[in-house]
């Protein structure tokens, strides 16, 4: 005799997650807002985003539309966004937003490294060589000595700036 509505003990339990209608609406509104932010970006920037072709076309259309047509197109973009994975799109958008602050942080890091090269000498240069093996050790040592002399004599920091330019060029090559 067959059992009805019973699972065998070896079958895994399926957990059903109930989502309220309000929560679904909030999620859809978030996707639509993400779509609005994408519409505000330049086409050259959008090329770097992981978007489907339909979504790319909808965004391009929304950028051309005005007022009511734009509002309807944004709703369509929100609908298309439901079929996309929003996490990589959000990550790419965050990267675009924080591009300036990331560049500033990288420059501060290079400035601190330059200060260490001038103050600590060979020990800091060894650290630079670990980070950037293609760096010219001899030139860095020479510039570090010159920068220390310039600082002591109160002269303009020509070598100090040149060390920074070398580190900046090495950092850009690595990227």
Curated annotation (Swiss-Prot):
User: Does the keyword section mention rRNA-binding?
Assistant: yes
Lineage per the UniProt record: Bacteria, Pseudomonadati, Pseudomonadota, Gammaproteobacteria, Vibrionales
Against InterPro entries, the record matches this protein to: DarP (IPR006839), DarP_sf (IPR023153)
Gene3D superfamilies named among the record's database cross-references? PSPTO4464-like domains (1.10.60.30)
GO CC annotation terms, alphabetical: cytosol
- What is the role of this chain? Member of a network of 50S ribosomal subunit biogenesis factors which assembles along the 30S-50S interface, preventing incorrect 23S rRNA structures from forming. Promotes peptidyl transferase center (PTC) maturation.
**Coiled-coil region(s) at which residues?**
none
The answer, when asked if Cytoplasm is one of the entry's keywords, is yes
Provide the species name: Vibrio parahaemolyticus serotype O3:K6 (strain RIMD 2210633)
Instruction: Please report the name of this protein according to its UniProt entry.
Output: Dual-action ribosomal maturation protein DarP
Protein's cellular compartments:
Cytoplasm
Query: Which Gene Ontology molecular-function terms are recorded?
Result: ribosome binding; rRNA binding
Pfam families, alphabetized: DarP
Q: Which HAMAP family match?
A: DarP
Hey, which family's this protein in? Belongs to the DarP family.
What keywords are assigned to this protein?
Answer: Cytoplasm, Ribosome biogenesis, RNA-binding, rRNA-binding
Which GO BP terms sit in this record?
assembly of large subunit precursor of preribosome
């Amino acid at each position: 005799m067959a059992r009805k509505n019973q699972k065998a003990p070896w079958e895994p339990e399926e957990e059903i997650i109930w989502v309220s209608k309000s929560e679904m609406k909030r999620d859809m509104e978030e996707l639509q807002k993400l779509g609005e932010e994408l519409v505000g970006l330049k086409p050259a920037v959008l090329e770097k985003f992981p978007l489907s072709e339909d979504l790319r076309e909808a965004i391009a259309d929304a950028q051309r539309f005005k007022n009511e047509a734009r509002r309807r197109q944004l709703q369509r973009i929100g609908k298309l966004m439901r079929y996309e994975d929003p996490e990589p799109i959000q990550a790419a958008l965050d990267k675009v937003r924080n591009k300036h602050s990331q560049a500033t942080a990288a420059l501060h890091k290079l400035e601190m490294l330059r200060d260490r090269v001038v103050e600590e000498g060979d020990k800091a240069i060894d650290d630079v060589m670990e980070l950037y093996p293609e760096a010219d050790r001899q030139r860095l040592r020479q510039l570090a000595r010159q920068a220390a002399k310039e600082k002591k004599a109160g002269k303009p920091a020509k070598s100090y700036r040149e060390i920074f330019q070398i580190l900046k060029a090495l950092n850009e090559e690595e990227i």
